[in-house]
Amino acid sequence: VSSPQAKIALFRSLFRGRDDVYPRRFESRKTGRSGYAPACANEWIRGVCEKPRIKCAECPNRRFLPVTDDVIRWHLSGSDAEGQPFVAGVYPLLQDETCWLLAVDFDKSSWREDVQAFADTARRVGLPVLVERSRSGNGAHVWFFFEEPVPAAMARRMGCHLITETMSARHELSM
């Protein structure tokens, strides 16, 4: 059994992206709409944050929050220090246009078969994968982790090549 700190260290060693900002999941109580937005230290502070009148991307007062061990701890436990639901994401594209990982998303009705075929293709060419069930339960992400940052364009080409190879064996797979 690993200590909480060891679990955080393992998670951070795999799911590496930008350290200066991370996306946080939100869910609107009014509309039920959900998504991810950059975590901001000024969010909803009266007189500073002008949401919803102004979008975060256009806000002169935005102050992104960095990825910390606490952020990872909250993500892994599912709630923040105040006990509120907490889910963090990762911005994989680094500022120099490299990345530490590639995630491929499958969410069509045949996602189970598609993921299996895609993972088989990757393993056949010697690439280890991690398969993660989507939050909704109606899809999955297939993750590839690199030992060092690689050009994002190269990672994308690798993913496209694997999809093309998979499609030659499983014609039902669509982009």
What is the role of each PLM region?
Residues 139-141, 168:
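Low-complexity, flexible helical/coil segments
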Residues 163-175:
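Flexible helix-coil linker/hinge segments at domain or subdomain boundaries
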Residues 4-138, 145-161:
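Signature for HUH/AEP ssDNA processing cores
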